[in-house]
Amino acid sequence: MIAFKPLAPFGVETFDIDLSKGLAAADFVELERAFYANQVLALRAQHIDAAQFIDFARRLGPPQPHVIDQFHHPTDPNILILSNVKDAAGRPTGLQDAGSYFHTDYSYLAVPARATTLYSRIVPKVGGDTLFANQIAAYDDLPAAMKARIEPLRAIHHYGNRNDVDEASRTAASVLNDAQKAKMPVITHRIARPHPVTGRKALYAVSGSSFGIVGMPDDEARDLLDELATHATQPRYQLRFRYGVGDIVVWDNAALLHSATLIDPADARTLWRVTVLEVEPGAAAPEVLAPTYAAPVR
């Protein structure tokens, strides 16, 4: 049995797994159950290479390379390097700002992200935490009238942040070159979206990539999305995750919003990231993912 310690107000961590020694099938089942029950799963103090990291991530789902390809890992394009470290020539070695605003990874794709994994390689002296906001709890707390209002609605998503008012105001992570933009379609997702594994409804990506609502005037749609985002990111729904060197954190994109936090530019930080996609809609979930996740692991 793997020992899990609760984070607060959701999420769990464990020191019982050493990915450098491989991961038994039974242990993976335990980890996956803890992941779906608690939305955030941290594997502390890992010492693995890029191949071992991607092997673990593939257990969670099919990896999808990030559209910003200039910061792919040199040995595997499925790993995105997040870093403020520069090389000897002064060139960036990674993507410095991966989203210091609440958002959902890959919500701009037709088949969005199941999970994101971050592996902390260099930790800053101060800050660099990740904030998570529980969108299942946020949906549950909505008034009945608001739940009824949003039930039939689909939000319009594309790459970026709706609070970037123009190209000049965008963060580095939000500005794509023409070839990268061509890969990014405009798609829609339900605002009140059932979780693809547990079936629990959550507010889905109401902050970040949601720019409008199908069939609704722009101003009205923006007001509704902003109202939902303000509700969904209240401190009572948030977890602040603090990294140690070698920590791996995995989070459930169907259930959470998340945000990076800024650090002193002089303080070095590097992480590796792999994001894996959900099972295609309509595909049967593996038997081990039958609804056994209603109660958190505590």
Language model segments and positions:
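Non-heme Fe(II) oxygenase catalytic core, chiefly the N-lobe of the double-stranded beta-helix
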Residues: 2-248, 254-298
